[in-house]
Amino acid sequence: MRALLLGFGNVGRGVADILVRRDQYPGLAALDVDVVGIVTGAHGALVNRRGLDLARVLADWSRQGGFAPSHPDHADLGALEAIRAVPCDVVVELTPLTRRAQGEPAITHVREALRRGRHVVTANKGPLAWAFPDLASEAARRGRHLLYETTVMDGVPVFNLARHGLRGATVARIEGILNSTTNAILCALERGEAFTDALARAQREGYAEADPSDDLEGWDAAVKLAALARVLMGAALAPERVAREGISGLDPSRIAAARARGARLKLVGEAWREGGSVRGRVGLREVRLDDPFALVDETSSILRLVTDLAGSVVVTEERPDIHVTAYGVISDLLTLSSAPPPRPRRERPARGAGARSRRPRRAR
């Protein structure tokens, strides 16, 4: 299977590292993947139709922070050009989320790849949060797989759990602690750290961005919640329609007050069915100490799916590192390597011009 990677940040390099060391993992024995192209936004691109030497790619990146024009596989290609020009079986979308652009250009990358007959694995949650129904329909029409396990909770099999483990059950409600940065900062505030110190430490340790506003203002959790609601609840819930409260400007007295009431203050995302639609919100909530949500510390996360038939299902993730996130992509590649492509969905012709009508049966 030939893979084209769009983006080579922490997750992309984690994927490459796992592929380089795949012989160390018995469960990856069946994974036959050649990365034939890597495209970055500002650090160049590499293309080799026989497969790139990923060990050398990682070493060069570590030394140079990009792809030098002198590299024998260097190519002057952007993402869309690569999708159109580089023969591959799967496009792996690893570019950063652009919330202000409502998921673009990742949405266009995914759509173009599907239209050209490629399978798609995306770690970017934007295409799910803003365009999932259209992209899923495009994949079905083309008979291609669209996989996205890494978009929420890193490598935890959230979507595979719902797809294979909750067959026949309807998700009525979603609740989750979905943003690692804000949860770690809240834990630090509980210990008496100043907000600015807690944020600076999160940035030093690499789980907060240089511009942390999307995390602190609840946008990251809102985008993840919208992605979950679209996929698991069939909801037309865009991130902008999720009511939002972040932790910027949080009065530390709220944390102490929650503790005095036998609770912890957590930033929780919720989506629920109401009046034929799905509503969502992200906000600070006091959770009782006997609630599993109260046990979620530092960069860990948790998701609760409330269903009609399977009851309440809870999954947690404890302090993931970048290889856990990369594993979600590897898991999707394993799915592609073992699953036959779905049959293209035929569009039914509409009644009217060009549509064949049936003759009414003669009454007997």
Placement of each model-derived feature along the sequence:
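N-terminal glycine-/serine-/threonine-rich beta1-alpha1-beta2 phosphate-ribose binding loop
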Residues: M1-R115
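Conserved active-site and cofactor/substrate-binding residues in soluble primary-metabolism enzymes
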Residues: L6, N10, G14, V33, ...
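General beta-strand structural signal in soluble alpha/beta enzymes
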Residues: V90-E93, V121-A123, L146-T150, R173-G176, ...
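Rossmann-fold NAD(P)-binding glycine/threonine-rich loop
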Residues: P96-R116, A123-R163
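Hydrophobic beta-strand scaffold residues
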Residues: V120, L146-L147, E209, L265
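Rossmann-like NAD(P)H-binding beta-loop-alpha module
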Residues: A140-A208, W219-D220
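Catalytic, metal-anchored helix/loop core of enzyme active sites in primary metabolism
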Residues: R173-E175, N183, L189, R201, ...
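Substrate-binding/catalytic subdomain of NAD(P)-dependent oxidoreductase enzymes
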Residues: A188, L199-L295, S300-I302
